Amino acid sequence: MLRLVCAFVLVAASVARADAWKIETVETPGAVRELIELGGEPRIATASGWFSVVTDGARVRLEKAPPPRFPPIPTDALPDGRIAAGKREFARAWLAEPTNRYGHGVLGDTIEAGALVVERKGGRRETVRLGNDSVFEDLEPRIADLGGGEKIVAVKSYLAAGSALAVIGERDGQFAILAETPPIGAPNRWLNPAGIADFDGDGAVEIALVRMPHALGRLELWRWSAGKLLKVAETGDTSNHAIGSRNLDQSTVGDFDGDGVADLAIPSFDRRSIRLLSFRGGIREIARIKLPAPAATNFIALASQGSPEILLGTADGKLFRLHR
């Protein structure tokens, strides 16, 4: 196996706490095309093929790796969708029943999902099917522990009113949409989830989303409590998606200030800076790290010597490592 040991070139960084966070260029064999996680392990695609990522103390190594092998896609699944794996009650879930009834095309084509399929651990499948007034404008359902049990978070878009965030789970023995945020209010208006965690340390789980990441860039925090979604915080100057891209994970969750509470790493509205945000006791910017070009790939969270790190690619094909 060919092994590539990466060299790191320090780049000037504009940060809110310059002594705490750095940005380094990771020299790669060719332009970076894609960052994914496969079985919990990071994989990076460049013009020269696929590489795995290995942390070694204060350094990161890229090792040549075979192309990833994804599980077979069910016949009813969205063609460009991804299968989500559960940990407890659910085996997996996917978006299904492709439809072209909503022509927004923000994710690269006008084919969206008309249904969500959940497969239990024993193999039994349940389908949540939408009416003709809406679609799932998403690529992968997010399985998360909300309120003591696994539930699914997905983007539901109304043909006449735009996107809402939907929480799907079991009610009276059947799967259904348990709650959703109000839709944006106009067609072709979309939102993108950014992270799911207890962001303020109160024991309840919040869902972070960016409302209209291409036109408004408003980050909102919605708490799941007693079967309902309650907006508890919001701020501007964020984005986690580029129009037409299938990269929906341009953000990541980690404890970036060391206080034991989850924080959020997310691009600024122009995607030329990475903002590290804390929500404990109010919204606070831990650091703002300037990028040489707009963020373009999914983010991958790493841990080196007990500290969180972030890998991401930019629109000019470069790979960057953000760390303390």
Locate each region found by the language model.
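Beta-propeller-forming repeat regions
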Residues: A18-R324
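Hydrophobic h-region of N-terminal signal peptides that target proteins for export
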Residues: F8-A18
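Sec-dependent signal peptide recognition
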Residues: M1-A7
